[in-house]
Amino acid sequence: MADKTIFNDHLNTNPKTNLRLWVAFQMMKGAGWAGGVFFGTLLLIGFFRVVGRMLPIQENQAPAPNITGALETGIELIKHLV
């Protein structure tokens, strides 16, 4: 009976042991996926930080946005129509 262990008798294991092994495998598989997603996200954030630091520092040369520009355009359109 001493030669009967889980390692050399894996085909005739107890159903309870099979369930425990399956649950443990599923948990390890889920932990692997979670770790992969977590570290993948960290790598992506790090990549964007490196690319952002390589870009030149320049001020925006465009003029400030005109918030009332749409209203002025609408008023001019109404004046042309009337």
UniProtKB/Swiss-Prot annotation:
GO terms for cellular component: plasma membrane. GO terms for biological process: photosynthesis. Keywords: Cell membrane, Membrane, Photosynthesis. The keyword Transferase does not apply. Its main location: membrane. InterPro entries: Intrinsic_membrane_PufX. It is found in: Cell membrane. Associated with the reaction center - light-harvesting complex I. May play a critical role in facilitating the interaction between this complex and other components required for light-driven cyclic electron transfer. Belongs to the PufX family. This is Intrinsic membrane protein PufX. The lineage of its organism: Bacteria, Pseudomonadati, Pseudomonadota, Alphaproteobacteria, Rhodobacterales.
